């Protein structure tokens, strides 16, 4: 595992001619610490493919240098987290879905590609305690603006117009409240089909709505999620219904959990006042900071923002020092001034990670990392120690 000849096992520092030179870990730690101490506003983004212990170690550094900590939720389910803060959530674990759910709705998501084990382990095919017939005992709905492979696995596919999720959700809620639809079609769906959908949902014994980025990253954003959560509240007047965001990208759920219990906010946390955390969507989110040109240095940990951020944000980040901590070579490491490789979490080192239903799982080490390669926790603690030494000299 991960023993290819081209794997990077030593830190690489970019030279004036654009090439990379291998340096020692001590030199890399000193370079990173000096960058963090010198910068007046440091963006510490990522925390996706790493353990909760590493996140906590990174947050300790951010408090001391006044950095801003953000994670992958800012480009995926950040709006879902905002909606949950606004209206709460009725949810469950994936184990309950497997054992109880007889009605599954995939809304704006495509787990056949993004979560390839989701349907076979939890949502469609498994036989649970109260769902002994497996897929035959479940009714599967797919609601999306395009026909996907998940739609092929569904019993009923409802195609809605792009950007009209809010209106469609509102129409279902109207029917559930006993109202009548005055338009012949809403979001491209006939009114009688919306009424039939509402009746199907009411007849379920236990239903679950899985919300994807097609709902959180389209027109309406957090208001779409607000409406979906309120739909489950309405359905609970008739039967048992829950909702769950389809979180992606490794341990991004864990990052939100750790930030939440440490500072009270799940992403985009401004620690420029030390442990007095602040959060404001659009102000302290990574992309907005970069687009406004406020960031003086970037520390990217266990993520590849250069592959997912808008090109303008990536260009803005590249104008200032960048350190990337990641076991792999990716788009971000190639624009970084310093790339520090670490052990692969969940393979070469253990730690805690959160499943998409916020269940913590202990990752177990499988093999040893290459000789001399530090874990991310060890590296971050050494950076913190060096930061303390530099701050003491000021």
Predicted regions and their residues:
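Active-site phosphate/pyrophosphate-binding segments
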Residues: 167-168, 176-279
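Short alpha-helices
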Residues: 144-146, 150-182, 213, 221-228, ...
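Receiver (REC) domain switch-region micro-motif
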Residues: 44, 104, 209, 298, ...
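Long, C-terminal catalytic modules of enzymes
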Residues: 338, 357-394
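N-terminal export/assembly segments and adjacent metallocofactor-ligating motifs
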Residues: 1-175, 188, 213, 294, ...
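Extended redox/cofactor-interaction regions of prokaryotic respiratory oxidoreductases
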Residues: 62-125, 131, 229-334, 343-348
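Short, surface-exposed amphipathic charged segments that create phosphate/polyanion-binding patches used
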Residues: 83-89, 172-177, 256-263, 338, ...
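Short glycine-/acidic-enriched loop or helix-start segments at secondary-structure transitions
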Residues: 54-56, 115-117, 152, 219-221, ...
């Amino acid at each position: 595992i991960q023993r290819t000849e081209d794997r990077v096992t030593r830190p690489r520092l970019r030279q004036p001619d654009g090439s990379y030179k291998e340096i020692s870990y001590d030199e890399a730690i000193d370079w990173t610490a000096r960058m963090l101490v010198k910068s007046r506003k440091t963006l510490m983004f990522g925390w996706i493919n790493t353990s909760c212990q590493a996140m906590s170690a990174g947050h300790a550094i951010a408090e001391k240098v006044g950095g801003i900590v953000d994670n992958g939720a800012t480009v995926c389910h950040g709006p879902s987290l905002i909606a949950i803060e606004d209206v709460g959530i009725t949810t469950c674990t994936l184990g309950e879905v497997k054992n109880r759910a007889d009605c599954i709705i995939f809304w704006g998501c495509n787990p056949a590609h993004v979560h390839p084990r989701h349907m076979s382990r939890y949502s469609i095919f498994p036989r649970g305690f109260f769902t002994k017939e497996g897929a035959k005992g479940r009714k599967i709905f797919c609601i999306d603006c395009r026909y996907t492979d998940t739609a092929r696995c569904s019993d009923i596919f409802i195609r809605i117009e792009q950007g009209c999720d809010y209106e469609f959700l509102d129409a279902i809620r109207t029917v559930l409240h006993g109202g009548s639809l005055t338009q012949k079609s809403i979001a491209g769906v006939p009114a009688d089909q919306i009424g039939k959908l509402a009746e199907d949902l009411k007849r379920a014994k236990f239903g679950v709505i899985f919300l994807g980025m097609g709902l959180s990253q389209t027109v309406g954003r957090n208001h779409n999620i607000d409406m979906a959560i309120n739909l489950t509240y309405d359905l609970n007047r008739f039967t048992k219904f829950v909702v769950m965001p389809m979180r992606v990208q490794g341990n991004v759920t864990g990052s939100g959990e750790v930030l939440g219990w440490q500072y009270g906010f799940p992403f985009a946390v401004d620690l420029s006042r030390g442990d007095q955390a602040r959060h404001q969507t659009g102000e302290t989110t990574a992309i907005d900071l970069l687009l406004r040109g406020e960031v003086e240095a970037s520390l990217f940990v266990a993520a590849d923002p250069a592959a997912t951020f808008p090109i303008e944000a990536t260009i803005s980040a590249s104008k200032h020092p960048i350190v990337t901590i990641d076991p792999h070579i990716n788009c971000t490491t190639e624009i970084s001034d310093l790339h520090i490789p670490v052990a692969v979490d969940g393979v070469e080192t253990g730690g805690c990670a959160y499943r998409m239903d916020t269940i913590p799982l202990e990752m177990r080490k499988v093999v040893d990392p290459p000789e001399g390669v530090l874990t991310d926790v060890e590296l971050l603690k050494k950076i913190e120690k060096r930061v303390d030494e530099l701050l003491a000299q000021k």
